[in-house]
Amino acid sequence: MTTTLQQRESASLWEQFCQWITSTNNRLYVGWFGVIMIPTLLTATTCFIIAFIAAPPVDIDGIREPVAGSLLYGNNIISGAVVPSSNAIGLHFYPIWEAASLDEWLYNGGPYQLVIFHFLLGVFCYLGRQWELSFRLGMRPWICVAYSAPVSAATAVFLIYPIGQGSFSDGMPLGISGTFNFMFVFQAEHNILMHPFHMLGVAGVFGGSLFSAMHGSLVTSSLVRETTEIESQNYGYKFGQEEETYNIVAAHGYFGRLIFQYASFNNSRSLHFFLGAWPVIGIWFTAMGVSTMAFNLNGFNFNQSILDSQGRVIGTWVDVLNRAGIGMEVMHERNAHNFPLDLASGEQAPVALTAPAING
């Protein structure tokens, strides 16, 4: 008997690299999307940290009134932010090499564009990496579909809204108080609280929280006892076990009697699909709402107050929203020559600007 030994051809360096990139045996899966994701997210994170700590004031409104956002210029963790790029730049792409100097680039808010462009590209690739890893492992692709909800929301506030408003200075600042300022101004200019898509988003987020708490508490309350009373119930589960760790029949019976029979799921798969779909669809609607309001397709506006037969104002919740919106909009426009046009023009309409007198 003759045995022939053939030496295996060594794989090229490129093939070895491809195998390492796509290997699911690595501690952290890289993937082809990860090749772009890793450097872009590292760049965005590094620039954000440096700008949050030490960036000089930015002329956000383009009127030579710089706004300081970094820690070294008097802010704290709550008030600090990476200030959006200047209104003088508008929607122009503003990399470092487009500025005459580094000082000019910093003054016009160049770090903001650098952070958001690299961040958005990074999270897009993170979404693609989720699909890629699911594909390699033979899983279904719903993880990346769920992740598309926060990705679409981030894209709406950082990219779509500035495009619709005509300037990256209208983008959301990268900070805690900057986020709240963005929300106030958004309400003042677009009446987002009266937009149906925002209402669906609120239902998605709060409803998702409620359903998550209900599901977790039901499962925890119907665990199959595998331990003694002096041991933690967590020891009753072994990773990879085939047996159910909780009694879905008991949970179904409890919840069906607590509310009514058909309010409870009797199928674990449909239950978990519902838990995933509800908040995702809600946040999708919010992202669509912000994207449409970016082009000034705003929420419902009830600008005229309700009047009685003698012309006196009947105060409603709408009047409260209108008064708050007008106040926030005026405070937002810091320079007189850029007074909000919807406040400076138009026919006079009776609006409840004073609190009703209470006689008692």
UniProtKB/Swiss-Prot annotation:
Residues recorded as binding chlorophyll a PD1, renumbered to this chain, are 198
Q: What else is known?
A: Cyanobacteria usually contain more than 2 copies of the psbA gene. 2 of the reaction center chlorophylls (ChlD1 and ChlD2) are entirely coordinated by water.
Please state the gene responsible for encoding this protein.
psbA
Q: Which residues form the propeptide?
A: 345-360
Q: How is the cofactor bound?
A: The D1/D2 heterodimer binds P680, chlorophylls that are the primary electron donor of PSII, and subsequent electron acceptors. It shares a non-heme iron and each subunit binds pheophytin, quinone, additional chlorophylls, carotenoids and lipids. D1 provides most of the ligands for the Mn4-Ca-O5 cluster of the oxygen-evolving complex (OEC). There is also a Cl(-1) ion associated with D1 and D2, which is required for oxygen evolution. The PSII complex binds additional chlorophylls, carotenoids and specific lipids.
Specify which residues bind Fe cation according to the UniProt entry for this protein.
215, 272
Entry's Gene Ontology BP terms: photosynthetic electron transport in photosystem II; response to herbicide
The name this protein carries in UniProt is Photosystem II protein D1
